[in-house]
Amino acid sequence: MLDTVDEALRALVGALTLEQKVRLLTGADLWSTVAEPAIGLRSMVLSDGPSGVRGPVWDERDPSLNLPSATALAATWDLDLARRYGAVSASEAKRKGVDVVLGPTINLQRSPLGGRHFEAYSEDPLLTGELAAAYVRAVQEHRVAATPKHYVANDFETERYTADVELDDRALHELYLAPFEAAVRAGAWLVMSAYNSVRGITMSENPLLTTPLRTSWDFDGVTVSDWMAVRSTEAAAKADQDLVMPGPVGPWGERLVAAVRSGAVPEAAIDVKVLRLLRLAQRVGALDLSDSALRDNGFDTAAVASHGGVAVRNVPAREPVPIPDGSQDADVSDYEGRELAREVAAAGTVLLRNSGELPWPSSGPGSIAVIGEAAIRPRTQGGGSATVVPAEVVSLVDGLRAALPDATVTVHPGVPVQTGIHALPRGSMTDPQTGEPGLRARFLDADGGELLSEQRYAAQLVYLGTVPAGAATLELSTVYRPGPDEPATVRLGVAGVGRIHMEIEGDTVIDTVLGGGGEMLGAALFAPDVAAVSVAVDRERPVSVVVRLRLENDAAAAGLVAITLGTEAAHTDPAGAVAEAAALAGTADTAVVVVGTGSQTESEGYDRTTLALPGAQDELVRAVARANPRTVVVVNSGGPVLLPWRDEVSAVLLTWFGGQESGHALADVLLGRTEPGGRLPTTWPATEADVPVLSTTPEDGVLRYREGIHIGYRAWLRAGVTPAYPFGHGLGYSTWELADLAVSAPEQDGTVAVTLTARNTGARAGKQVVQVYLSRPDSAIERPVRWLAGFAAVSASAGESVPVRIDLPPRVFAHWDGGWRTEPGAFAVHAGTSVVDLPLRGSAVVGAGG
């Protein structure tokens, strides 16, 4: 009998043939790994999961919990909430049969133009790393693996597959590697390598996969590639890249077997990769190591024994974080998941401005004019591979009407946020075959023969790896009946990539080829081109609609098909829409305008071209504010946008992409039932010209991080420019006073304890985020003006004082100089409630370190 799980795993590796081992190192399909029944190894399922766990398919028939975006979670500054968020994600993964969650995304928000920032936490490495560590621990307590991504410096989307990032050592270690180190030291079982190159070497071949990842941080898990990121056989195999996704086709397979046999790649390198994969399988429960399991599967246990012994079960494994005994595997109910989503959404809502309008009285205003496309159809998540399909989305209109059943809530859609279509709601469609709500989807072969027919309940469909073999056409058919609020003429359309043919009542109305914006998977699937046609509709006379999509492009050949049937915003005069909305606002006690970004603005696959709100939303806000001085603006975006009217309205709330319960959460905040607990995890500029680090576009294939260690608020402080709202900013419904700052001498392990008292001086319970920053103005080396060193979210009743202790680890005093070094002497310690609101100051004296 072997003494440890690792010894048993090594024995199993030695008993496999080269072909068996190599086969394990490329995915079986888009979302799962290869099984090896002979050793009790089942396939492991991987799924995107930064803000909800999709599972192996996007399918409304198996919906997912849509949690608030990563920026919303980061805005809570609450590690306990991050832990609970991770626990719910693990429960969702188990419900979906998922072993590996592909998250958290812990790239930094280097420039506010980054198109995927909604999926990442912050511009600050410490805040990002602390949240990531809490999430990773919570997910893995349930024997589901977490996957910090994208390692490393994939902080942009433009040319992400080919761009080379050029940066100095200090920026690399102090900023971009730091969150990954925190996640790995928290016990992460996987790390995802990025598409981009760093210093001329693509990340799936980069020596950074070895040092510092494995040599300095002791990472013993699996390095999985981003999808289709591995481009080579020998170079990637000789690097510490372990698993190629997706499969079964890839650059390894038979070519890697040949490379090993020729001596170009040592077999020992393959053995190490397989060992890591088996270790992951054992951790998530995908590998049965018992003798009986091996014998039941026909495996020769003597062969295992000949390599050092037989397999074992339930013996200690060398784990950064111990595998739990299963006692933490209790399911989270649907209700509990939705309540957590609601809590996080409220806790992450940032009150940017309040002139006394909020909170409303518990009974609410008598009449409320709710204005804006996002008030009716909120963006609950960003676009791209992380998209999930929730069972239900609560809009602000829904939330207010539920919270205030006696109030008069009137609605105006405002102005279009973007071009494109909104998927037809289930209630407006009838499957012509069954007569039930929904549509009929059929895959046809080249001769028109039916390969698959199914009823679907959503008009936005994504097929990933589930397209039948031989399919040449996807056909959608439904009977469309417009809703009661639809105009007499609608623009009915389709979004997709490929040749599109649409018929209405048997007449061809569209026959064209559509392309997709952005790059590869994310944008091509979630922001494709649109074709639409105006159709006169009568609610008493529904119309038959048939759409056919030819499956001829590269994505379809890879089994990736996406199509949406919906209505396009009518091409009305924006000025007329603004006037209508303002007139409505003038009749109400108060007005709420919801503004935001669209899927063509914030999505995986491309970066933003401007920070301005799309369309005529700025004009809309100003007109409504003139018509009703009690105007509250809600910002529904994943990252910073410009708010030029911010001083012209009564209140501004930032809800990010708030998840499926965002409407309930926002109603809770407006009515004061819940504190707007958020504080900014990123700096919000007043103008685009003020932003010190803006470009996300490579020059001749190279993106140069010329700013070094000065990104985010560090860059703003260095430039001496005042933003609209600084990092860490956020108001509440109470007032606070911080006092009694004390800074300890370094403890034996180098930790410096910062203590203070936080007193709620307001008339109601509230939340505050106490933030501690360091500075070293007399430093002999280049440093930021200030940098975040620690934080704590605290709550207190009216008049209550609470003690706060924030421990500063030695690393926050250190800088990178070929290794971690600490400049001896006094560091200024600043405590307060944002990077610029720091009323308390002390000093920490530290010795040299390295």
Model segments located where?
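Glycoside hydrolase catalytic-domain context in secreted enzymes
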Residues: 1-816, 821-836
